Amino acid sequence: MKLRLGTRCVIGGLLALATQLVGAVEAGSSASHEPFAGVWQIDSPVFAVRTMAGEEPPLQNAAAQVYHRHIADRKQGDTSFDSATWCASVGIPRLMFIDSPFEIMIGPRHVAFMHEWNWWARVVYLKGALTSRAPARSRPAHSGHSSIDILPPIENVMTLGPVGLSRGEWVGNVLVVTTDHLIDTTLIDSAGLPHSDALKLTEKLRLRGPDVLEDRIRFEDPQTFTRPWETVVTYHRKPGQRIHEDVCLDRIKAGEPAVKE
């Protein structure tokens, strides 16, 4: 089982960017938002996402057929519909749902989420961190280059990808993050909930206590859902810990599932 060159370049590029951000984040972190920094792990891993009312997401007919087919296939032991089983990125928001820790680093222009699973990273661009010029949407063209500047030009980041493009702002002590440009080859959860590349996520992250982080997520995707809907997940702090290497292919070789659910 091998990762394609393009996949390796994406992972390497994101990790390079997040690594470059570490120094900038620590050097310019905001004291008022510093409590968000640290390592977090989900309280209850989410296998099948439900609405705030505990119901199945409001799916369009075509999307519902795909979703229920995925559920039936998984019950039969067929997970070929889930590209994460061969170590493609689980993407956003699924990275926030799985049983894998992540580290948050706070800076004046960025917030970095560094995930232990296969070392994927997400950078949230705060106001002023991106130029205002927005090109047409496109799927990523793999150039073979893995280095990414600390502030990549917007034409390099506004392509469809597994973690999309995240813009954020602090509203008091709440981090509001809007993510779009999400490629439709990923799934929202491990049960197989699909989405289109029109998916828009709005996250409101806040501390419910010194060691409890809440992420309230709003889903908007008219091609997949009949209406916008929300869910909420919580995480607990892991004091004194750092994230470690968790290579998906190594997990598979050891007979473990690609994604710990």
Feature locations, PLM:
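PEST-like low-complexity, intrinsically disordered acidic/proline/serine-rich tracts
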Residues: 23-261
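Bacterial N-terminal signal peptides
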Residues: 9-22
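N-terminal secretory signal peptides that target proteins for export/translocation
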Residues: 1-7
